[in-house]
Design a protein with these regions (language model features):
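Alpha-helical metal-binding/catalytic segments enriched in His/Glu/Asp
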Residues: 1-11, 98, 214-221
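Generic solvent-exposed, charged/amphipathic alpha-helical segments
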Residues: 2, 6, 116-120, 153
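An extended, acidic, His-containing surface patch that forms the Zn2+-binding/catalytic region
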Residues: 14-93, 104-114, 122, 126-232
């Protein structure tokens, strides 16, 4: 199992599943420059994660790897006897939980199919492979040329006194793509938390300052959005 998983990436951390990148849209240099405008300290990033260095897909920065590039990650692996003490058993089964973060234009159903076919094909003939899909979500990127984005940018600048920089994030909010599919509307995502808030971690927290600033921003957003729609 470990050997099979290792074959899923090459030495440049490029995912080796045939067809995995076929629908990935490469960003222009201008778009990559826009991403680089966002405040980010690699040293602080490494310090927060207690790392001496970072690694990932060659040719991309850490911000790009976490925001615009698809990934394949092993979330857990186990098998055989894992209790206290020792038992000289030969494991008959081994398991791994694997997730893939997708980017716009990729399909979770298609990627699941490609993964299943490839993972099965690289298995030794002496073993059986069972892939059990759990759930998936379509990737989404909010457009920055809509009245909603203009209103959001204005609201953030009014509240915080600085023009916001749009960023792409690898977080999963599957319902956003579903909104567009079912309702035919674009979504805009406003974030008020900080990287240091440790979202989904044991010590997750959210500052009162940003809580109230968020309320203030939402008021400015709806006021500006309403004005823009009336002006059409």
């Amino acid at each position: 199992l470990c050997e099979m998983i290792a074959k899923m990436k090459d030495r440049n951390n490029h995912i080796t599943i045939p067809g995995f990148y076929d629908d990935v849209i490469e960003l222009s240099n201008e778009e990559r420059d826009d991403i680089a405008r966002a405040p980010f300290s690699l040293d602080e990033y490494k310090k927060a994660l207690d790392l001496s260095d970072v690694h990932g897909e060659e040719g991309y920065t850490t911000m790009e790897r976490t925001g615009i590039r698809p990934t394949l990650d092993v979330n857990g692996i186990w098998g055989g006897y894992i209790g206290e003490g020792a038992k000289t058993v030969i494991p008959s089964k081994a398991y791994a939980k694997i997730s893939m973060r997708l980017v716009p234009n990729q399909s979770d159903k298609e990627i699941t199919k490609l993964f299943t076919n490839y993972f099965t094909s690289i298995a030794p003939k002496s073993v059986k492979v069972k892939v059990s899909p759990h759930h998936g979500g379509e990737p989404y990127v909010s457009p920055t040329d809509t009245p909603a984005y203009t209103a959001a940018s204005h609201a953030m600048e009014t509240t915080y006194g600085k023009k916001p920089v749009p960023v792409r994030s690898g977080g999963s909010i599957p319902i956003v793509a579903l909104f567009e599919k079912e309702l035919g509307v674009k979504s805009i995502l406003l974030g008020f938390g900080l990287d240091s808030d440790a979202i989904h971690s044991p010590n997750e927290h959210y500052g009162i300052f940003n809580y109230f600033k968020g309320i203030e921003t939402i008021v400015y957003f709806f006021k500006k959005y309403s004005d823009l729609l009336k002006a059409k």
